[in-house]
Curated annotation (Swiss-Prot):
FliG is one of three proteins (FliG, FliN, FliM) that forms the rotor-mounted switch complex (C ring), located at the base of the basal body. This complex interacts with the CheY and CheZ chemotaxis proteins, in addition to contacting components of the motor that determine the direction of flagellar rotation. Belongs to the FliG family. Transmembrane segments: none annotated. The keyword Cell membrane applies. The record marks R174 as: Part of the EHPQR-motif. It comes from Rhizobium meliloti (strain 1021). A motif (Part of the EHPQR-motif) lies at residues 139-142. This is Flagellar motor switch protein FliG.
Length: 345
């Protein structure tokens, strides 16, 4: 039997006049994608979005009405009038005339690769290569080779350099000859890598160690040493989290020479002079050896005049500005705060 209720609803829908946007959608659909696609560039972004919305809810358009619509548009002709799947047809037209990114934007979608979460190997790049190398050094060479082969090359190179000279040849050989890895073994390794990343991200995002390090960086070395020793009696783990974030003026002595040169390259003569007042002879010499001869003579001349009338607070501020710059440059990978420890024999 005929569904008269449905028939009546369709009749009422056909009686409703089309809006200008609906007319445009109907004509574009009737043209076919090759012709309609060429016309899309003449519409603005907002107009295209309105036409897409209209096409998705467009009622059935009978041939005689469609003919009348087409007559409203000069120089246009129909290329088939199948309007059964308006949404799909409009998508096809968009793909004909626009780039994939533009189509995705108009349809409110994004390509899978764009929305897909960054892989665990890309996330590793936010970690400290020194710590990653220390963790990997405990693993089997084949595991290390697999992890290095999966890392972004720039980060993998940094990690490789942190591994011992004794380990590198075997790891490189295994990485060169690595073949299909057992999926189960790969899944186990990747699960562990995810755990490491999450642990490191949690530590990095924790405000506690960073805040305590900031406080200690304002103190003198004897005070910091005393506080760390006291903290170590309570929690060795807490000391391990805080100590790497602490960098005092006296620690400049333990920087690699090339890093010292880079650090003081952009520090003004006045700041260096103020920071060196009252400093130990060995530290002073290490800093003066990192600057140009002319600048060194000027600083030595000022220091020879003595420290009379110098405010200790100004000395502390100058030293703090230098250590802050060192921490900043280290965080960006431009220098090293400490010499690498010699490898065990």
């Amino acid at each position: 039997m005929t569904d008269f209720g449905s028939f009546e609803a369709q009749a009422q829908a056909l009686a409703q006049p089309l809006s200008q946007t609906e007319k445009a959608a109907a004509v574009l659909l009737a043209m076919g994608k090759s012709i309609a696609g060429k016309l899309l560039k003449f519409f603005t972004q907002s107009e295209l979005q309105a036409i897409i919305a209209a096409a998705q809810s467009l009622r059935a358009v009978p041939p005689h009405e469609l003919e009348a619509l087409v007559n409203e548009f000069e120089d246009l002709f129909t290329e088939g009038a199948g309007l059964m799947d308006n949404a799909k047809a409009m998508e096809s037209i968009l793909e004909e005339g626009l780039t994939p990114d533009e189509v995705d934007g108009l349809l409110g979608r994004r390509a899978t690769f764009q929305s897909y979460e960054a892989s665990i190997w890309d996330r590793l790049m936010d970690c400290d290569p020194v710590i990653i190398a220390q963790l990997l050094a405990r693993e089997h060479p084949q595991t290390i080779a697999y992890v290095l082969s999966m890392m972004p090359s720039s980060f993998g190179a940094k990690v490789l350099l942190q591994l011992s000279d004794k380990q590198r040849p075997e790891i490189l050989n295994r990485a060169v000859n690595i073949k299909n890895v057992n999926p189960k073994a790969a899944a186990i390794i990747e699960a562990r890598v995810i755990e490491i990343i999450e642990e490191m991200e949690a530590d990095r995002n924790s405000p506690g160690p960073a805040k305590i390090a900031e406080v200690m960086n304002e103190l003198e070395k004897p005070q910091v040493d005393t506080l760390l020793a006291s903290l170590e009696t309570i929690s060795t783990d807490s000391v391990k989290k805080v100590r790497p974030k602490i960098f005092l003026f006296d620690d400049i002595l333990f920087m690699p020479q090339r890093s010292r040169v880079q650090l003081f390259n952009d520090v003004s003569t006045d700041v260096i002079t103020m920071a060196l007042r009252g400093s130990a002879a060995e530290l002073r010499e290490s800093i003066l050896a990192s600057i140009g001869a002319r600048q060194r003579r000027m600083i030595e001349s000022d220091l020879a005049a003595g420290d009379a009338g110098i405010n200790p607070r100004d000395i502390a501020i100058a030293r703090r500005s230098i250590t802050q710059e060192a921490i900043r440059l280290s965080a960006s990978g431009q220098l090293e705060l400490k010499e690498k420890e010699p490898e065990a024999a």
